[in-house]
Amino acid sequence: MNAVLSVQGASAPVKKKSFFSKFTRLNMLRLARAVIPAAVLMMFFPQLAMAAQGQDLMASGNTTVKATFGKDSSVVKWVVLAEVLVGAVMYMMTKNVKFLAGFAIISVFIAVGMAVVGL
């Protein structure tokens, strides 16, 4: 006959490491060793670090982007239509009003995002 012994009850608590345990002296030295060379290079070559005399390589595509995603483009209309359809279908499936009103919230986010970007 085989006997099986089992111990039941609370196990020993496992201590969770503190967030501040990452800020040890050794870790700070490692961080300094990684950051100081980059800081020295940026100090000696500031024009490379800040791209002061840089040329905008994407400027030629501004008209294409505005034509594709601008206020009067068909892409924005199709995205809004897809939002309305998905919101309606999700509302019919779940009967949750959040899905029905979600398209309005997403439309506001899209309008604000396009205004911020400049489209």
Swiss-Prot record:
Q: Which InterPro entries did the record assign?
A: TraA (IPR008873)
How does the protein associate with the membrane? Multi-pass membrane protein
Kindly list the residue ranges recorded as spanning the membrane.
74-94, 99-119
- Give the signal sequence positions: none
Q: Which residues lie on this side of the membrane: Periplasmic?
A: 1-73
Q: Which UniProt keywords apply?
A: Acetylation, Cell inner membrane, Cell membrane, Conjugation, Membrane, Plasmid, Secreted, Transmembrane, Transmembrane helix
Keyword Transmembrane helix in the entry? The reply is yes
- Stretches of the chain found on the membrane's Cytoplasmic side: 95-98
Modification sites for N-acetylalanine: 52
Disulfide pairings: none
Q: Which residues form the propeptide?
A: 1-51
The listed locations are:
Cell inner membrane; Secreted
User: Subunit details for this protein?
Assistant: Monomer. Interacts with itself to form filaments; also interacts with TraQ.
Protein name (database record): Pilin
